[in-house]
Regions:
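Active-site glycine- and acidic-residue-rich loops that bind
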Residues: 102-103, 130-145, 171-180
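Structural recognition of alpha->loop->beta junctions
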Residues: 81-89, 155-158, 190-193
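Noncatalytic carbohydrate-binding groove/subsite architecture in carbohydrate-active enzymes
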Residues: 110, 125-136, 150-151
Length: 210
């Protein structure tokens, strides 16, 4: 659905909701910036129950900008919740970090705000560094441990938090290497933090030679 126009994505989602395999269907994922576009389709769910949403937010170039974006995201979410009470449920937000090494105090403030507003949260790294092991010393000679592992460990201490890993897209950098995927799974497993994968299904190949 992510590569379809919103009306087609909604139509397809409803078809699957009415199908025999609806039990496996997750939340409909949408950027917060598209809330207004979504409104016209909400009556389609009157007979299906509330539309369950996972929303995309966060981002920014600095920690302070990230926190301000989170505050605005929460305000927009609560406005949408109030306006369409009983028709939608928003209980998950996926947030892109501003940097790979965010301030602990900023992250604590952001996650506290998200928790206070009944939102589980998955955090996506700004840009994953290269994973490289020197097999003679078994040491990682890159920034993976100092940036990614330390940040995963920090976020794992925060309530209702998870890690998001992008696994596909239309550019080369959107495809993590096998080593990055394995290292991220290991980091999340060791720190006992939930993780989710995204984008791998609708963009399995970044280029077609046509």
């Amino acid at each position: 659905p992510a590569k379809l126009p919103l009306n087609e994505a909604i139509d397809e989602y409803i078809v699957h909701l009415k199908g025999e395999n609806s039990w496996i269907l997750g939340r409909f994922i949408i950027p917060i910036s598209q809330f207004k576009d979504l409104e016209e389709f909400l009556p389609l769910f009157d007979s299906l129950g509330p539309l369950r949403l996972s929303v995309l937010g966060g981002g920014g170039k600095t920690d302070d900008e990230y926190l301000n974006n989170i505050k605005q995201n929460i305000a927009d979410i609560n406005d949408f919740r109030e306006k369409h009470s009983g028709k939608i449920e928003i209980d998950v937000i996926e947030c892109k970090l501003a940097t790979n090494t965010p301030s602990k105090s900023i992250m604590q403030k952001a996650t506290d705000l998200l928790n206070e507003n009944d939102l589980k949260h998955f955090h996506e790294f700004a840009e994953l560094p290269y994973v490289g092991i020197d097999y003679s010393t078994e040491l990682d000679e890159t920034n993976w441990d100092s940036e990614v592992v330390s940040t995963v460990a920090m976020i794992s201490k925060m309530d209702n938090a998870g890690i998001k890993l992008r696994c596909g897209g239309i550019v080369k950098d959107a495809f993590p290497s096998v080593e990055k995927v394995a290292a991220m799974i290991q980091a999340c497993s060791l720190n006992k933090i939930p993780m989710k994968f995204t984008a791998g299904l609708h963009h399995p190949l970044r280029h077609f030679e046509e």
